[in-house]
């Protein structure tokens, strides 16, 4: 036996492994239509059965994680469409199928057509996100393409009326089921684009079987949706129903009611937002007024600090301080001179030169006299300046005016009485005199003819 022949010798296990790998690699997944027989379901939950036709049969298994997605329970003798992978059970050398999904034969053929069209349109780019148009926000007018007598239209109108009653709606009635339905749906989409009345379209219908929804898996409908210049929201069936129209549309809604919510504004939410904006504006206004009130208070305080009465009082206080300082300074100088004189006298007494003492005494007396004269002149000057300042202060004092025989009269509101227009007969007045106040009542108001002023008569 040659070396090359020896390398081609297989063991049984190696043969079965090689065949299994070849089948799985070359065949992959396939669609198979057949009749079920020998169906069984052990405690593990897996399904085991035979798929056959009138000439052959093959073993098949469907594991629990796959069969739980099946919407029906298979029966012996039932025609089904199965998507499965081909493999080989190595211990026995039996080749078999591992089913991934299963449908009744009628729906299964439709599903196969669905998958084929889906792959074709996806390859052409009809599902690409780059082609999706954004929905208007907010929509000004909504178009609805569906059956005029279906529950879907009722649901859409009910939601729009609840959320946004003022939103205009245009209905493009069409069949949604049957042989003629796809062409009618296409024409309705084209008509809506031709009229350009709406800025968003809802295309859909209520729930049903795969066959009932088949109009929305039609290639013509898919291309009409793709070519629409108006954004389209698909709303076909229930949330679990998926059609070709859902993939092509600019946005998919799980139900017609959900589509109506997507294209409409929630007026309750808008009112809530407006109320929030109003509350924020009120808070901002309150803050602004509080800031302006504080500013006004500060300005009022500054104005009060500049009042003439306060300024006069401060000047008078300053004058009094200066007077005290002047007097204290003079007294201090006198005390210092007196102490110096005493020291000199003590020194003179110790020396006792009588003549010199007499002369020094005279000089001291003269100096003391001149000093007193100088201090007196300086004090007189300060007194004169102080008297002038007091006279000036007295001249502008309201009390000095009262002392000269004048009076100040106030209205009941507390304002100074300047003209007869401020009062009328029966009003009570308060008059400020030099030594007190007088309360009076007006009995008559007379206007002077020459000066055109009213005369106030009091009692």
UniProtKB/Swiss-Prot annotation:
CDD domains: ExoVII_LU_OBF. GO terms for cellular component: cytoplasm; exodeoxyribonuclease VII complex. Keywords: Cytoplasm, Exonuclease, Hydrolase, Nuclease. It catalyses: Exonucleolytic cleavage in either 5'- to 3'- or 3'- to 5'-direction to yield nucleoside 5'-phosphates. It is found in: Cytoplasm. Its EC number is 3.1.11.6. It holds the Pfam family tRNA_anti_2. HAMAP family: Exonuc_7_L. NCBIfam families: xseA. Heterooligomer composed of large and small subunits. Bidirectionally degrades single-stranded DNA into large acid-insoluble oligonucleotides, which are then degraded further into small acid-soluble oligonucleotides. This is Exodeoxyribonuclease 7 large subunit. The gene is xseA.
């Amino acid at each position: 036996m040659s070396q090359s022949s020896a390398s081609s010798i297989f063991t049984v296990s190696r043969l079965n492994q090689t065949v299994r790998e070849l089948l799985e690699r070359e065949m992959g997944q396939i669609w198979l239509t057949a009749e079920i027989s020998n169906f069984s379901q052990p405690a593990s939950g897996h399904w085991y059965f035979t798929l056959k036709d009138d000439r052959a049969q093959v073993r098949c298994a469907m594991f629990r994680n796959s069969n739980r997605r099946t919407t029906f329970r298979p029966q012996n003798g039932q025609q089904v469409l199965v998507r499965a992978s081909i493999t080989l059970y190595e211990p026995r050398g039996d080749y078999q199928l591992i089913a991934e999904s299963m449908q009744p034969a009628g729906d299964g053929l439709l599903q196969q057509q669905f998958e084929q069209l889906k792959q074709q349109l996806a390859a052409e780019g009809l599902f690409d996100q780059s082609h999706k148009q954004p929905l208007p926000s907010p929509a000004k007018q909504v178009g609805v393409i569906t059956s005029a007598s279906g529950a879907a239209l009722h649901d859409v109108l009910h939601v729009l009326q609840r959320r946004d009653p003022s939103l205009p709606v245009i209905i493009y009635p069409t069949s949604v089921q049957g042989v003629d339905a796809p062409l009618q749906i296409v024409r309705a989409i084209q008509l809506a684009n031709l009229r350009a009345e709406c800025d968003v379209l809802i295309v859909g219908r209520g729930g049903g079987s795969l066959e009932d929804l088949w109009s929305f898996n039609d290639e013509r409908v898919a291309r009409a949706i793709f070519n629409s210049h108006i954004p389209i929201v698909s709303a076909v069936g229930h949330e679990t129903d998926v059609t070709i129209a859902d993939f092509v549309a600019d946005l998919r809604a799980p139900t017609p009611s959900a589509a109506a919510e997507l294209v409409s504004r929630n007026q309750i939410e808008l009112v809530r937002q407006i109320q929030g904006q109003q509350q924020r504006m009120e808070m901002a206004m309150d803050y602004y007024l509080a800031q302006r009130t504080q500013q006004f208070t500060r300005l009022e305080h500054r104005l009060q600090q500049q009042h003439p009465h306060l300024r006069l009082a401060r000047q008078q206080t300053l004058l009094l301080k200066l007077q005290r300082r002047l007097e204290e300074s003079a007294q201090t100088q006198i005390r210092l001179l007196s102490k110096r004189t005493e020291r000199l006298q003590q020194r003179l007494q110790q020396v006792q030169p009588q003549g010199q003492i007499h002369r020094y005494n005279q000089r001291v007396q003269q100096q003391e006299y001149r000093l007193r004269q100088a201090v007196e002149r300086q004090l007189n000057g300060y007194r004169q300046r102080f008297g002038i300042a007091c006279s000036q202060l007295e001249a502008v004092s309201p009390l000095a005016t009262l002392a000269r025989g004048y009076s100040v009269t106030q209205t009941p509101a507390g304002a100074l009485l300047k003209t007869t227009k401020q009062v009328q007969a029966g009003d009570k007045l308060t008059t400020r005199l030099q030594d007190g106040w007088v309360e009076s009542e007006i009995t008559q108001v007379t206007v002077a003819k020459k000066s055109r002023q009213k005369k106030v008569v009091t009692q």
